[in-house]
Amino acid sequence: MKFDNRSLSLAGTENYRTERRPAITYPGTETVEWYGYRRHNFELEGRKGFIVEPPNPAPGLPWHWCAQWAEAFVPRTPALKLLDRGFHHVHMDVFDTYLNKEGVAVLEKFYRMLMDLGFYPKGVMTGMSYGGLISFRWAAEHPETVAAIYADAPVCDLGFGLESNADTAPELREHFAQEAVKRAAAYGVKIEELSSHPLSPNNNVRPIAEAKIPIYCIRSGQDQSVIPGRNIDVFSKRLKEAGGVIEILDRPLYGHHPHGLDDPQPLVDFILRNYPF
């Protein structure tokens, strides 16, 4: 299946409103308004998810997947502009799995559901903070399903937050310790084994690199939550060494928040450049 850039650039125009296409039967029984768009809420395997319907779906049904924090900083992310371009916007909550094998299995069913709806085989992912962990884990497990990744202050180290140094916000250390216990339980290892776990994104760059999945990452130099030196700096170095593709937007004076950009158009442009039109 092929897209052409002109088709997506026309999404939302009168030309699109007159084009006939098969109706999509969305999952779930609840439809709500979300930033002026129609959002279809559903449950899968007892977990909540949603699909936001673009006013005029583009040919081939391209889609954008927010891995985590789907309600955070939405206008600063690519989500709304991509909806106007005809992309569907989707989310599936697997946060408490930290994308262990159970989480991957849920997302595999989610992906099959999207394919049954006729969506394009590859989506583009947004991974903010913990969403980076989910995005990179999914892309490593199923690189054939990912066209590109926009990452933002991403978690790349399963053992993140365990370091005790001046860069880590003191008020977050207790929370990090509790989170580490949960992550260790999810992966069935000891806390001290999290950083060296073979599925930690820092240690599992090769599938993403070999698939040449393009990544655009916002790095925040003053981040005291997800320390760049233990996360994206390690990940990007190893990814490049493995032949991967990553572009870093370095914001040396920014902290962990806010995610996204005042004008998210550069993020949209990155996605449109790398979606398989």
Please give the residue ranges for each predicted region:
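Glycine-rich nucleophile elbow surrounding the catalytic serine of serine-hydrolase chemistry
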Residues: G127-R137
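Hydrolase active-site cap/lid region
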Residues: R137-I191
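C-terminal catalytic histidine-bearing segment of alpha/beta-hydrolase fold enzymes
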Residues: S225, R230-F277
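Alpha/beta-hydrolase active-site loop
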Residues: Y98-G118, R137
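Short amphipathic alpha-helix adjacent to the substrate-entry channel of hydrolases
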Residues: F73-V90
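N-terminal cap/lid segment of alpha/beta-hydrolase-fold proteins
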Residues: N5-P59
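Alpha/beta-hydrolase fold nucleophile elbow
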Residues: G118-S129
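The feature captures the conserved acid-bearing segment of alpha/beta-hydrolase catalytic domains
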Residues: P170-D233, K237-K240
